[in-house]
Design a protein with these regions (language model features):
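Generic N-terminal leader/processing signal
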Residues: 1-2, 215
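Sec-dependent signal peptide recognition
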Residues: 2-9
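Subset of outer-membrane beta-barrel
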Residues: 21-412
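Hydrophobic h-region of N-terminal signal peptides that target proteins for export
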Residues: 11-19
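A periodicity- and composition-biased signal for non-globular, repetitive helical segments
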Residues: 9-10, 36
């Protein structure tokens, strides 16, 4: 793939990104800022979202900005990904299925100078998408239909930089521009009386800063451990919200200044590396959503997540493409930030497995692209009674292009 083709591809992906299907159809996206997107790329998704201790010159790891210092001297990486999913909703004996597709991320990584790497990319921060209704009997001759719809989301273009001041220490910083629109609408339709509607609208324009660090401890030539940590401080999201209440005879509008807050986030983890063949690790993430407001009224629950994963790479170099496939699997358990009923939230767990398949040039010597494929099962179960269970079967597909942009060619 030449530079012109890559430029065209990047331009198209950037242009269609905000307009692609947001890939969500969940009633739980009506809470807060919606369903939080997976803030990771191809290899992380194969390992349950693991990433605080991962670093590699072959892949981009946006989970920890300190990993950008591992960028290769002579190459530039481009990575893009999509996902396809089938969702099952269960409420009592009732079941409904839905299918979604989404554009998930676009990123690039390159070396600025010795021991300094940079990454630039685009991915969603959260997604909102739902539409459902329920019918109630208000009396002998009157019924009401409650309807709920929502759409929108928050997007996150970012730029990150990392520096390796010591052979075993890297520090990094990612700055993101957070922007988007969120709309919720709730309506009540009566058979014999006045209809009512409440509309929630928010426009978000803010920023997000993530600070990362990684430390490598080598035990011998075969064994090492990489420790990683990331911190992001919370602040107002500069989100002006509007609530409009209407019925057949009147309309009221309320303006809310700074209707949303971004939570502070802390995460830490490690990766144990054995001969660059086996890698295994654990991550923990905590987000202080209980200090965040949504439309100036409701608050969230503190979110925590534990991830674990393993990677197996049979060999570094081989003429047999199948011997260079890298295999990964992982799992996670999380408590989402959404408060759905009487102070109670949900439990979420997921398992994933996948592989990365390299493609070689005509001389079978250099990999210009790596295909990432993973399957994922996710279950979301509410702690409150009378709520909906959600189960996801998801296929993640990503591709990394490895271009030798900085190689000096010799003319004979």
């Amino acid at each position: 793939m030449n530079k012109r083709t890559l430029t065209i591809l990047l331009t198209i992906l950037i242009a269609i990104g905000p307009y692609a299907d947001n890939g969500i159809n969940s009633p739980y996206s009506r809470y807060g800022v919606g369903i939080l997107s997976n803030q990771s790329l191809g290899i992380n998704r194969q390992m349950g979202g693991l990433g605080y201790g991962l670093r590699s010159p072959k892949y981009i790891n946006i989970v920890n900005p300190a990993s950008f210092s591992q960028a290769d001297t002579l190459t530039m990486l481009f990575e893009a990904g999509i996902s396809l999913q089938n969702v099952n909703f269960k409420e009592g004996d009732k079941r409904i299925n839905a299918k979604n597709a989404s554009f998930d991320y676009l990123a690039m990584q390159f070396r600025l100078r010795n021991n300094i790497g940079m990454s630039i990319g685009f991915l969603p921060y959260s997604r909102v998408g739902y539409s459902f209704s329920q019918t109630s009997n208000e009396g002998a001759s009157e019924t009401s239909i409650d309807t709920y719809t929502g759409s929108g989301g928050i997007y996150q273009p970012y730029i990150g930089i990392a520096w390796k001041p010591l052979p075993n220490l890297s520090v990094g910083l990612t700055g993101s521009y957070i922007y988007g629109n969120i709309t919720h609408e709730a309506g009540i339709n009566f058979t014999n009386s006045t209809d009512m509607k409440k509309l929630y609208e928010a426009s978000i324009k803010s920023y997000k800063l993530d600070f990362g660090v990684q430390y490598i401890k080598k035990f011998d030539e075969a064994r090492s451990v990489t420790l990683g940590a990331v911190y992001s401080f919370g602040h107002d999201m500069n989100a002006d919200a509007t609530i409009t209440e209407t019925n057949s005879s009147s309309s009221k509008e309320y303006k809310i200044k700074d209707g949303f807050k971004l939570p502070s986030t802390f995460g830490a983890g490690f990766i144990y590396n054995y001969k660059d063949k086996w890698k295994t690790g654990v991550d923990y993430t905590f987000q202080k959503w209980s200090s965040s407001d949504f439309f100036g009224m409701e608050k969230g629950l503190d979110r925590s997540k534990v991830s674990a994963g393993v990677e197996y790479s049979p060999t570094k170099l081989s003429n047999n493409i199948f011997k260079m496939i890298e295999y990964r699997m992982g799992a996670y358990y999380a408590q989402p930030y959404t408060e759905i009923k009487n102070g109670k939230g949900c439990e979420e767990y997921g398992i994933s497995a996948g592989f990365s398949l390299p493609f070689f040039n005509s001389n079978n010597r250099f990999s210009h692209a790596i295909l990432h494929v993973s399957g994922e099962f996710v279950s979301i179960r509410p702690k409150a009674s009378g709520m909906i269970d959600e189960s996801y079967l998801r296929l993640n597909i990503g591709i990394t292009f490895n271009e030798s942009w900085f190689v000096k060619m010799k003319v004979r």
